[in-house]
Amino acid sequence: GWSTNKELDNSTTQYGSYEVNNYAGIQSSPTVPMYQALAESLNLPAVATANDLGLNTVFEYGKKFGLNMDKVDKSLAVALGAGVTTNPMQMAQAYGTFANGGVMNDAHLITKIENASGQVVKSHSQKSTRVLSGSTTDKMTNMMLGTFSNGTGVNAAPYGYTMAGKTGTTETSFNKDLSGDQWVIGYTPDVVISQWLGFPTTDENHYLTDSSAGTASEIFRNVANSVLPYTDGTQFDSVKNSYAENGIAPVGEETTETDSKEDKGFFEDVKEKASNMVDDAKKAIDEADIPGKAKNAWDTFKGWLGF
């Protein structure tokens, strides 16, 4: 396998008729180590890597990670996600593979449904698939720890917790200085947080003005500061940040404890409302013994979700 320090091409911009550049035209050096290319979300090394590995391998692993590749054009643009339709749930499932040591568990919204008496009406049957070896997974986490310490996710780093992950930004077709989609995905050994920011349809009236390193990262940090205190707080014991391994110190300002407490207060309010929703849901499900009542229960759920 490749070393996390492997130097990748950061200069080739033309592959036949396909032209590519780094976001905002950034090009620091002709080559960059792989850990830096990933942490800084550089386009040129990603496309160069896809070109070296071959599109068959790229598509094979896209499918292994649960992505629908059937209608995606077989071009190098796929290295940047072009043509791949996905959502936060699918991406949480994919990145959960790294958090689980290379094993992907199928994502689901409901683990089980109980009635008001506590009886289980329906439960989810977990399916697990090994996608990567443990050693490969460790290398990926080594590099993705750098996203939050030195890369495009420094503004998303939560207080008191170490996360690994990736950011992503798509340019609009009508203005390269504007963006249509912004992703921030982070994980610990306990949890994956997958966030997308954008509009259902991007056009000249609906767009974002910065990259995922800006507003999207600030939102992610608030969410992470709220969620992580309720996890086990498991550390990445078997891996080390690739930047630290190369003697490079973290950059950016660390989130303060005050910020974390404010975010946690917001989450407590959400948690209380969610608990009330669960109690109401149990009652609605227990009473939904005929089609008409079942429909009322479903309408109640849709109302909570804002549909």
Go through the PLM ranges and name each one.
Residues 62, 299, 303-307:
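Periplasmic/cell-envelope proteins involved in peptidoglycan metabolism and beta-lactam response
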Residues 263-301:
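Amphipathic alpha-helical membrane/lipid-surface binding segments
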Residues 6-9, 36, 46-49, 61, ...:
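Structural recognition of the beta-strand scaffold that forms the well-ordered cores
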Residues 2-58, 119-146:
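Conserved catalytic neighborhood of penicillin-recognizing serine enzymes
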Residues 1, 12, 38-42, 49-53, ...:
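Sec/Tat-exported extracytoplasmic proteins
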Residues 30-34, 42-49, 54, 58-61, ...:
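Stable alpha-helical elements in mature extracytoplasmic
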Residues 3-4, 86-250:
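A penicillin-recognizing enzyme superfamily signal
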Residues 19-26, 54-93:
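Mid-domain, small-residue-enriched loop/turn segments at the edges of structured enzyme/sensor domains
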